[in-house]
């Protein structure tokens, strides 16, 4: 296993402090005085302390956001000024890119290369959404009454409660802040308790960028306390949540009490299809990267691989070889290609699925088990023999576990029916040179995002899921509109 780099002095200095909550433009301790520890998942060692915000702190943060929203300076701020704030924040992220990437890797376990990519993605997300400030406009419809004139306008929905997961913390924070500010909202950001450190650093940059007091508030703490309080607060107009389907269901239920607007980006069990005419080398690498990236802790991870029988053995051998060749180690080690899972609990969850799979009749093609030593590592694993009634086939594992299944039918409807036999519908990947086939299969798959031949996900593309993979869309124009209300104004003259 590779050896971690020494912690840079800037990061070491940051970790030496016990971090508070950003409320109304200033840092404060939690009202309870309680703190939470945060660990390096590569070793299990405590690396820092964060404030354990609770209901009282959430209330203070929401009220600060509500005051900021209603202040004339924010209500009348020209859209180019909101754009400038988001660009300034993106510039500061890029300035601090290296310490942020190291901190993200240390806190989450992801390899440094991925952490650097994630930090860059956070900056680009803010810049993309900044471009929408001032570009959302209403319409002037033609009315039936000749002496009437009417128009529509979009207005900010209000205070946004943004709850983010632990798998890509900084990117997720930026994805929530950008569209909310572009739309003219204020917000309270609640990071995952396991990975709050880069969100706290981001809070310092929010202050430095010149955001008005209360426009962006950050409350760390347990989801069952701080997150739950945010979901039911009467002054929160919208909840934007990314995380598990189970937690999303609980948040949706809580939000019903005040009929909040809700956007949910939830779990997935995404299929990957490889046809004989595909670029098989590229498809095998794409399938491997699609499940083993960030140790499989990605919502769109391609965790079910369907390869045509004619190329099945070749594809499975290539993907298994890729899995076995990956270098495990601490995320902060320069040679690491796959880091630890985020926590002991997540490791136990993945190990439980693997045990269930073996008990149900699956066999290891690659990986399996955990290496000796400290940390929350699980070897990248390829399982054969999975059936639709098995948990490894139908449940989101959120770990480096791929099930492989052959298909023989040329009937795309039958193939799509197999893939759609799940409660999830977030994404899918298709590998074929037959573009007609790709279009036809893409239309048959119940998923919000379909990628063909390794196409990427862009900030301009609306992103979200079908079925129990979520409500609404993030990214693109739709992502900004999700933070706005549409008002109709009619005038008789």
Region locations from a protein language model:
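Short, well-ordered beta-strand elements within core beta-sheets of diverse protein domains
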Residues: 46-53, 70-74, 162, 272-274, ...
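Residue-level signal for inorganic ion chemistry
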Residues: 44, 82, 104, 126, ...
């Amino acid at each position: 296993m590779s050896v971690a780099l020494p912690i840079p002095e800037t990061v070491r200095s940051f970790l030496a402090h016990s971090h508070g909550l950003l409320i109304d433009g200033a840092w404060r301790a939690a009202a309870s005085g309680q703190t939470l520890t945060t660990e390096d998942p590569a070793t299990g060692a405590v690396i820092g302390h964060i404030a354990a915000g609770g209901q009282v702190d959430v209330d203070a943060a929401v009220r600060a956001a509500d005051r900021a929203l209603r202040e004339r300076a924010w209500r009348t701020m020209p859209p180019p000024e909101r754009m400038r704030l988001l660009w300034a924040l993106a510039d500061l992220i890029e300035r601090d890119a290296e310490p942020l990437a190291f901190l993200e890797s240390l806190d989450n376990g992801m390899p440094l290369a991925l952490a650097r990519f994630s930090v860059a993605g956070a900056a680009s997300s803010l810049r993309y959404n900044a471009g929408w400030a001032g570009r959302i406009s209403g319409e002037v419809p033609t009315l039936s009454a000749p002496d009437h004139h009417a128009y529509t306008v979009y207005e900010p929905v209000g205070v946004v409660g943004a709850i983010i997961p632990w798998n890509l913390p900084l990117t997720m924070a930026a994805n929530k802040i950008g569209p909310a500010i572009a739309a003219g909202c204020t917000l309270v950001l609640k990071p995952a308790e396991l990975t709050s450190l880069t969100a706290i650093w981001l809070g310092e940059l929010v202050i430095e960028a010149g955001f008005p007091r209360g426009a962006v508030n950050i409350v760390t703490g347990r989801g069952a306390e701080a997150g739950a309080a945010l979901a039911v607060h009467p002054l929160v107009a919208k909840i934007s949540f990314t995380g598990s389907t189970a937690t999303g269901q609980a948040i949706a239920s809580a939000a019903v009490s005040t009929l909040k607007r809700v956007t949910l980006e939830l779990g997935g069990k995404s299929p990957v299809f490889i046809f004989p005419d595909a670029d098989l080398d590229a498809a095998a690498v794409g399938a491997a990267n699609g499940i083993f990236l960030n140790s499989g802790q990605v919502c769109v991870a391609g965790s079910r691989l369907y390869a045509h029988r004619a190329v099945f053995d070749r594809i499975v051998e290539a993907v298994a070889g890729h899995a076995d060749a990956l270098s495990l180690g601490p995320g902060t080690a320069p040679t690491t290609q796959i880091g630890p899972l985020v926590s002991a609990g997540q490791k136990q969850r993945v190990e439980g699925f693997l045990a269930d799979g073996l008990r149900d009749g699956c066999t290891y093609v690659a990986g399996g088990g955990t290496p000796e030593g400290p940390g929350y590592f699980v070897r990248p694993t390829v399982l054969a023999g999975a059936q639709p009634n098995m948990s490894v086939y139908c449940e989101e594992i959120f770990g480096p576990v791929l099930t492989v299944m052959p298909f023989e039918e040329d009937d795309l409807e039958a193939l799509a029916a197999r893939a759609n036999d799940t409660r999830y519908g977030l994404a899918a990947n298709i590998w074929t040179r037959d573009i007609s086939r790709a279009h036809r299969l893409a239309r048959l798959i119940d998923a919000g995002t379909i990628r063909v031949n390794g196409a990427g996900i862009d900030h301009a593309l609306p992103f979200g899921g079908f079925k129990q993979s979520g409500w609404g869309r993030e990214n693109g124009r739709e992502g900004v509109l999700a933070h706005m209300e549409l008002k109709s104004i009619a005038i008789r003259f």
